[in-house]
Amino acid sequence: HKSAKVNSIRTRNLIEQCDIAVVRFGEKYKQWNAAFDAGYASALGKPVVTLHDEALTHALKEVDGAAAAVAQTPEQVVRILGYAINGKL
């Protein structure tokens, strides 16, 4: 558990420094950690982009509701970030 605590310090620090938080949910990702990170970023006023399969849409409806954008593929995230940063799709 010590490494998890150290990692949480790093994660919190990176979220505090970010301009936009991209939070990925999926089979290989711990849902509760991702949900916590999304909530923390949102509480700090950071725009959140969620990334997850369509199968998780209902389960993540509250998280997606608080997100600035929702994506189902990494390519969609790239397009969202490109628009947010450069104003181009």
Regions found by a protein language model. Give the residues of each.
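Conserved catalytic or regulatory cores that recognize and/or transform ribose-phosphate-containing ligands
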Residues: 1-89
